[in-house]
Amino acid sequence: MNKRFLPALAAICMSSRLVFASAASPATVVEKSPWGDVTVELPAIPAQQFPIDAYSNDVNAAMAACAAAGGGHVVVPKGTWLSEGPVKFRSNCALELADGAVLEFSDDPKDYLPVVHTTWEGSECMNYSPLVYAYGCTNVAIVGSGELRPRLKTWKAWQKRPPAHQAMTAELYHWMSTNAPVAARDVTQREGNFRPHLIQFNRSNRILLRGFRINGSPFWTTHLYLSRNVLMEGVDSYAHGHNNDGVDVEMTQDVIVRDCRFDQGDDGVVLKSGRNQDGWRLATPTRNVVVRDCELVDGHGLLVVGSEMSGGVENVYMHHCKATGKNVYRMMYLKTNERRGGFMRRIAMEDCTAKNVRLAAFEIATDVLYQWAKLPTYEVRLTEIDDIVMRNCTIESAQRRDKISGDPRRPVGRVTLENVRVVSSRP
């Protein structure tokens, strides 16, 4: 199917260019952490432009021409445009959303076929394509001050997770637990209703996300998966549906998230590394992540690790962030269960604030299974939890300062709560 962009309003926009370093010597961004510098290599992308209105409003045609010419910027001009299908990245290309540009996405599931190699809550599968999808790409970016805006009617209906979805979830769990080939794990069959991600960078390197706005998401909003060298800055993310995390960093290394605003229906910044057998098979920890100067306007957790973290999560540092909403459940939350294995270690939050926290400001839970609790345990592997720090944080109100529910078979290791102050308690 030819995926085209249908302009409701259009005007050619000559926005300022963002010129990247050369491929021979990529520019870098460095942030400090307690465990050493985190260095991110930036993408090297030529400045030449490929406006989509020069390619019959077809962003993928513009992307193909851009890649064939050695790379550049695929520009979505000012106006409202409809994508009837996914944007599929090529290496050395940037998607530039010009000032005043709104890129809408259809909500017809057939537009996101054929299936692609993706994930569902930590399990690899073949599913509808993410709306913006990069697989195996190098030097890619989404930049500009425009907006990504998916239509959500179908995806909202799918949030109800009917019996057919629950049955397919159980089947995917069995496939994963028995190491079935990923190519055979097609979850689009029998009305499984597995919603696609909005943005997924899968097995990619040198990724820049800068300055644009997100307005809604079918599922996880921005998913960084099995990738390296990611800078996400100045992104304004709004999505208030089910499972609408702000950014999920999964089995991804060398990541900086800064100066972003998250207004979410689920967690804000989430660190993951695969579910059970898939996490063990891929064996790629999420590592070397710095998050600073971000705001969680609304959402369940400011910094959350898990529960899908079987490949391990380590060397994570959040500082000078704030949770300003009234419906934040926790500031820092580490969650796992007896099926996960893996590790959570060297994770720190410093100099952060929150207005209202509905539950505990800091929590560790080792028995989190959600809807998967009714499914069988194929193998017990306990999680190492050690060197966890929360320091110099102030919460205006919370039910309690901290709650730690460890597993006596593998007790929680070192936890430091230093100068963590709850001004007033709430029921």
Label the model's feature ranges:
Residues 4-13, 17-94, 98-203, 208-210, ...:
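Extracellular "leader-to-stem" segments immediately downstream of a signal peptide or signal-anchor
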